[in-house]
Amino acid sequence: MKHGIKALLITLSLACAGMSHSALAAASVAKPTAVETKAEAPAAQSKAAVPAKASDEEGTRVSINNASAEELARAMNGVGLKKAQAIVSYREEYGPFKTVEDLKQVPGMGNSLVERNLAVLTL
């Protein structure tokens, strides 16, 4: 009986060791592919960001007191249609902005988001 249990345990341990070795080998083969994909993604993003900055340098500025939500979303970096609509709603409820820094009072607009877009915003 003891020999049977020992044989069973040895067989199971060898089988588990073999399966874990195969799983580790497969995982190490898959990892470089994931790393290559991540490395290629920032390069594509940086290429896409260059044309957007070129249009900002042309002098396209948008008035936060007169622009529609669509215009704000198009001009501001990191602001989608929903946040742009929040800006317009805030403006309609509380009146025109007195400074560009007043955008920080709009829900969802943080300091970094306002600072990032100061170059394209005007009253």
Curated annotation (Swiss-Prot):
SMART domains per record: HhH1
All residue ranges annotated as the HhH domain in the record: 60-90, 91-120
Region listing for Disordered, in residue ranges: 40-62
Molecular-function annotations in GO: DNA binding
A Pfam family of this chain: HHH_3
InterPro entries with a match to the protein in the record: Competence_ComEA_HhH, Endo/Exo/Phosphatase_dom_1, Hlx-hairpin-Hlx_DNA-bd_motif, RuvA_2-like
Name the UniProt record assigns to this protein: Uncharacterized protein YbaV
Species annotation: Escherichia coli (strain K12)
Gene: ybaV
